Curated annotation (Swiss-Prot):
The lineage of its organism: Bacteria, Pseudomonadati, Pseudomonadota, Gammaproteobacteria, Pseudomonadales. It catalyses: L-cysteine + L-glutamate + ATP = gamma-L-glutamyl-L-cysteine + ADP + phosphate + H(+). One of its GO terms (biological process) is modified amino acid biosynthetic process. The keyword Ligase applies. Its EC number is 6.3.2.2. This is Putative glutamate--cysteine ligase 2. SUPFAM superfamilies: Glutamine synthetase/guanido kinase. NCBIfam families: gshA_cyan_rel (TIGR02050), PRK13515.1 (NF010039). It comes from the Bacteria.
Length: 368
């Protein structure tokens, strides 16, 4: 029997000036006060002074998630508008002066910038993170190994970072390209079980590569604070329905992987090769990529891959059905990355200068 899992969602936002479209290096105390007042206990400061996080409570269904995110996104929009600001949710800003940004004042963020220097300064990026709760007896590393092949499809559904420094990058998720500059931020390591994971952490800590309370930043990781697996690969999504789709689809994959966790895994080495290749293709081409099917190992479109998912993992809940329907819509009509590129092209075709065209892209990236 498939038992529903609880889940939670974390969204990162940059604070942008609604007039100029730019990200201020140091938002005013009034702006930060508006954020804290609007989000209350769900507010968190992120690694830049101009970046915040909305961290949800635990949900049991998609209705709860939609109601919470709608309400808090709206409260944040209204509060920030009073200061001429807005929450920007796409994964990268098309023209932010990232070299001028300031790290958040909290000590652990200062340590990040001291340790990683230019890599940290360049990481002016928004991600979408989804936690799904798992039973205590579940080996979360084995669960991650089962989920690994599907990660590139989830990235392809979320891409929203095609522009950087005022230019198209050629990648639909340039955010994940920058993430690749960090240690321990790619796909999860090939560790067969929880015992191997603990040995791996112990080795990193013993050799000074990881602090005692340090985190790994894998694209999918076991949370150190909660009994969850945490999806981290996805770009931030301005469109709320895209967020809900990804959260529900990931939860669906987790539930079925837990239910069938005693079944033998297929050849994990080959699946890892395929996952790594598909990951690059999702970064580069997003929904337009020709992927490699996980089992038959033949080329497949993103829509074909979604169809394979539905055939292999039967849709058995209303939330999962809605997620698959919306995922198909996204794969047919485009992610926010596609929307940004269309917006930029249309603005230039309409005769707008580069700066005005980029401001139009920023306007499209605020929360909706």
């Amino acid at each position: 029997m498939i038992r529903p899992c609880t889940f939670g969602i974390e969204e990162e936002y940059l604070l942008v000036n609604l007039g100029s479209g730019q990200v201020p290096a140091t938002p005013s105390p009034a702006v930060m006060g508006r954020c804290r007042e609007a989000l209350g206990r769900y507010f968190a400061q992120e690694m830049f002074r101009s970046q915040i996080e909305l961290a949800s409570p635990v949900f049991t269904n998609l209705y709860e998630a939609r109601e919470f995110l709608q309400r808090n996104r709206q409260r944040l929009r209204v509060a920030l508008a009073e200061e001429g600001m807005g929450p920007y949710a796409a994964a990268s800003h098309p023209c932010a002066a990232w070299l001028l940004q300031k790290p958040a004042a909290q000590g652990h963020y200062k340590q990040l910038f001291d340790d990683y220097r230019h890599v940290a300064r360049r990481s002016l990026l928004n991600g979408l993170h989804v936690h799904v709760g798992v039973p205590p007896a579940c080996d979360r590393m084995q669960l991650i190994n089962r989920l690994l092949p599907w990660l590139p499809l989830l990235l392809a559904l979320s891409t929203s970072s095609p522009l950087w420094a005022g230019q198209p990058t050629g990648y639909l998720s340039y955010r994940r390209v920058i993430c690749g500059e960090w240690p321990h931020m790619g796909l999860p390591e090939a560790l067969p079980d929880w015992a191997a994971y603990e040995r791996y952490r112990a080795l990193l800590q013993r050799t000074g590569a990881l602090a005692a309370d340090g985190d790994l930043w894998w694209a999918l990781r076991p949370s150190r604070r909660y009994p969850t697996v945490e999806l981290r690969i996805c770009d931030g999504c301005p469109n709320l329905e895209d967020v809900l789709c990804i959260a529900a689809l990931f939860r669906h994959l987790v539930e079925h992987s837990i239910a069938y966790r005693h079944d033998p895994l297929p050849c994990s080495r080959e699946l890892r090769w395929i996952a790594q290749e598909n990951y690059w293709r999702a970064m580069r081409h997003g929904r337009h990529a020709q992927f490699i099917g996980c089992h038959e190992q033949q080329p497949v479109t993103a829509q074909g891959w979604l169809a394979q998912l539905q055939a292999q993992i039967p849709i058995d809940s209303a939330d999962a059905e809605r997620a698959c329907q919306h995922a198909l819509h996204v794969l047919r009509h485009g992610t926010h990355a596609d929307q940004q590129l269309r917006c930029l092209a249309q603005a230039r075709a309409d005769g707008l200068g580069k700066g005005q065209a980029l401001r139009a892209v920023v306007a499209a990236g605020t929360c909706i």
